[in-house]
Amino acid sequence: MAGAGRGAAVSRVQAGPGSPRRARGRQQVQPLGKQRPAPWPGLRSKEKKKVNCKPKNQDEQEIPFRLREIMRSRQEMKNPISNKKRKKAAQVTFRKTLEKEAKGEEPDIAVPKFKQRKGESDGAYIHRMQQEAQHVLFLSKNQAIRQPEVQAAPKEKSEQKKAKKAFQKRRLDKVRRKKEEKAADRLEQELLRDTVKFGEVVLQPPELTARPQRSVSKDQPGRRSQMLRMLLSPGGVSQPLTASLARQRIVEEERERAVQAYRALKQRQQQLHGERPHLTSRKKPEPQL
């Protein structure tokens, strides 16, 4: 024990503070969690080559990546067929999925293929295999009862023809309805359009005869209904209604009484002014009422 300790001390003194053996020992004492993996020797050189690569030919210059992407996107925008094809393919895939769901056909359960991944420990690999196996067993137990030997009865040709005819009829009805709507719109546009002949002269703007429902009618100057205009217009004077005999007799009596009262008033005025009595006996014309 003492010899071993003395030998270690001698070796420590011989090594010295700056010897490479001591530095190597310190590197070995470092914990494993703080070690950094050394970079690959050719990695940085490749990166430098990628960044600072020179053109192969000085007379030719390659198109930048961004510019190539812009050119490709412009070409796709100019070609509308590609967008239509993508939409059509998506519609077909969606239709097939719906048909499979409607038929109730379930796909076969995929058998997992086990392969240990890079950097995966044995315990993690075994745990992953167990989980996938349990998942496959769960799916197989809960799967619906399948009878592959029983084939579905093919549809009769008459049913297929009926379905085809019904589809064609619906399509034709839809086309006919669209044509009728277009014709109605065209007719409405033609009715709203005024055709002006060549050389036609318009002296005044058109008169609007239709009035809104809640509008208040106001008389415009020059168009007011005047009494004089009504009287002068032919047929404007209203004809008196034919009165009965009793009504005519009452009117005659009232007129005679008014005439007698007027005569008495005039005679009284003459007496007050001292006129001669023979003038009062002169017959005067009756006033016309």
From Swiss-Prot:
List the keywords (alphabetical): Chromosome, Coiled coil, Phosphoprotein
Q: Which gene encodes it?
A: CCDC137
Task: State the superkingdom.
Answer: Eukaryota
GO MF terms here are: RNA binding
- Under what name is this protein listed? Coiled-coil domain-containing protein 137
- Give start-end positions of Low complexity composition bias: 7-20
Q: Where is the composition biased (Basic residues)?
A: 162-177
Any one Gene Ontology cellular component term annotated for this protein: nucleoplasm
Residue numbers spanned by region Disordered: 1-64, 149-184, 204-225, 265-289
Q: Does the UniProt entry include the keyword Phosphoprotein?
A: yes
Keyword Phosphoprotein belongs to the record: yes
Q: Where in the cell is it found?
A: Chromosome
* Chain positions found as Phosphoserine: 19, 233
Q: Basic and acidic residues compositional bias: what residue ranges?
A: 273-289
The parts of the chain that form a coiled coil are 155-197, 247-273
- Source species of the chain: Homo sapiens
